[in-house]
Amino acid sequence: MALCYGTFWGYPKMLEAANLMEGLVDIGPWVTLPRGQPEVLEWGLPKDQDSVAFEDVAVNFTHEEWALLGPSQKNLYRDVMRETIRNLNCIGMKWENQNIDDQHQNLRRNPRCDVVERFGKSKDGSQCGETLSQIRNSIVNKNTPARVDACGSSVNGEVIMGHSSLNCYIRVDTGHKHRECHEYAEKSYTHKQCGKGLSYRHSFQTCERPHTGKKPYDCKECGKTFSSPGNLRRHMVVKGGDGPYKCELCGKAFFWPSLLRMHERTHTGEKPYECKQCSKAFPVYSSYLRHEKIHTGEKPYECKQCSKAFPDYSSYLRHERTHTGEKPYKCKQCGKAFSVSGSLRVHERIHTGEKPYTCKQCGKAFCHLGSFQRHMIMHSGDGPHKCKICGKGFDFPGSARIHEGTHTLEKPYECKQCGKLLSHRSSFRRHMMAHTGDGPHKCTVCGKAFDSPSVFQRHERTHTGEKPYECKQCGKAFRTSSSLRKHETTHTGEQPYKCKCGKAFSDLFSFQSHETTHSEEEPYECKECGKAFSSFKYFCRHERTHSEEKSYECQICGKAFSRFSYLKTHERTHTAEKPYECKQCRKAFFWPSFLLRHERTHTGERPYECKHCGKAFSRSSFCREHERTHTGEKPYECKECGKAFSSLSSFNRHKRTHWKDIL
C-alpha cells in the first residue's frame, strides 16, 4: 500500500498523496495497488505480497510543522489519514502498542494529544459527526474481502494518530470483546524452520522470506533487493539520498525524519537501546535484538553445508558466501568485489580518502578501526578500559586487549597433531584447517584450507609471489596492505610511537623492541630450547623456527623453507637469476629492495634523515647506525672480550682479530 510513504511537508505533497489515494484499486485482501500499475508498487512491492506496516504509510507532523499548516491543508491531512485507516481497516490490519492511554494524560508533555482534536474536527471547525464505528460498519458490510472475518475490522471508538520518536501508533478503545478471528488468532502460526510463533499471516509470510531467499523489495537507486520493508529502510539509512531531511553535520539527506534521527546517532554516539543483562547499548533497535540472542543462545539459521548455526539471517548469509564464493558488493571505481557490504565501505575509503576514526589526543585520523585501535595503544591515559596487568587505561576495549597481549604469553589452545600452542580460539580454528583441509577455501598448491576468503587470497600470494599493493612514491610492492602502510611511514617520516627517552618509531613492534633496551629483563622464554628474549617481536620470530612447517624444498640442494617466496629467492643462488634490472645502467639484482637501494645512487635520493643533526642517508640501516653516535647505543657485544660496537660492520671486523689469535 504505497499510500503516502514518509512524512509529507506542505500542500503540494499532501495533494499528491490525496490524488494517489483516489487512484488506488483494491485487488484482494492482502494488497491495494495503484490503478494502471498492476504488477509492482512504487517501492518494489509485488502483487502477491502482503501489505506494509502502518508506520510505512502514515503521514506525520511535528508541533512546529502542524502550526504552519493552513486550515485547508489540515483538512486535507484529515481526509488523507481517514482514507488510510479505511484501507488498513479493510484488510484487517492490527498494530502493536495499541494501548497508550497513559501517554495522553498531559497535553504539554505529549504531542500526540492535540492530534486527537484535529482528527475529530470537521471541515467547518465543529466536531465531526461521523464516528469510526460508522466507518467500520460501512467497510465491513460493503468492502470486507471474503477471506477476512468481520472481527478483523473491529475498530469501534477513538483513534489517536500522532508523532512519536520512531513510529506512529493507533489506540483502539473498543468497549467490547472481539470474536476470535481464525485468520488473526494470537500466535496461530508457527514457523517450522525457526520455531518462531507469529500472530498474523502477513507476519508469517515476512518470516518465511529469509528462509526461502525471497527478496521482493528493491532499492531503485542501486538495485539491491531485500526480504522486508524494514531491511529496505535500513539500507536507505546507510545510503541516504536526495530527501528533504538533511543532516546538519555531514549534509547527507534522507527521505524520512526517522532515518535522519537514526543517522544522527552515528555523529552523537547516542545509544538508546541498552541490554538489561550486560548493559551494552546500541543505536539501532535491530542491533539490540541481534545482541540479545547472544544471551539466549538462540540460533535459528543453520547452514545446510556445514551445520553451523547463526542468531540472525545477515550473519547466516555472510557465512553462506564462504561456501559459494559470492561477492555481491562491487566497488564502482576499481571493480573490486566483496562478500560483505562493510568490507566494501571500508575499501571505498581508499578512493575517497575518508578517515572516520580520529584520535582525540593527537588528531591523527584512520580509515580502519583496527589501525585506530592499534594507534591508541601508544597513548597512555585514564581510559575506562584498563589493562589487567599494568593498569594502563584505554578508550576502547579492543585497544586494551591488544595491549594485554604484550604482557602475557598464555596460549591455552594446543594442537594435538603438531603440539603448537595458540592464544586465540579463532587462531586455533584456522590452524586446524591447515591439518584437516576442511575449510571452505582450499589451496590447490599445498592443500592448506582457510575459513576466510581474504586470508586465503593472502596465502595464495605466497605461492604466486603477487604483490598487489604498490607504493605510489617509490614503486615498491607488497603482499599485504598492512606492509604497505608500514612502508609508507619511511617516506612521510611519521613516527607516532614515542619512548620516554625521546626516541620515536614508525611502528609498534620497533617501539616495543626499543623499550626493552631500557630494561635488562628477558621475559619471553622459548619452551622448546630455553632461549630468552627481551622483545616479543624477536621471540615470535624465533618461535617460528620451531613450529613452522617447511614444506617447500629446493630440488637442487634439498634445503626446505616455510614459505614459497623464500624458496624462490633461494633458488636464485643456484640459477644466478637476477630478475630486477636497473633501467639506467642495466645492473641486475636478486631482490627488488636491492634494486631500489641501487637506484638511489643514480637519483641521489636520501630519504632517511637523522633527527639529531639532520644528516640524510640513502639506507635506513645507515641512518640507524649514525644515530647511535648521538645516543651512545652499542648493541653488538663481543662475547670473547666484552667490547661493544654501534655498527655490525665494526663488530665483524673486531671478531676477526680473535680469529687471528686462534690461528
UniProtKB/Swiss-Prot annotation:
It comes from the Eukaryota. A zinc finger (C2H2-type) spans 189-211, 217-239, 245-267, 273-295, 301-323, 329-351, 357-379, 385-407, 413-435, 441-463, 469-491, 497-518, 524-546, 552-574, 580-602, 608-630, 636-658. Its main location: nucleus. The keyword Electron transport does not apply. Residues 52-138 form the KRAB domain. Transmembrane segments: none annotated. May be involved in transcriptional regulation. This is Zinc finger protein 44. It comes from Homo sapiens (Human). The gene is ZNF44.
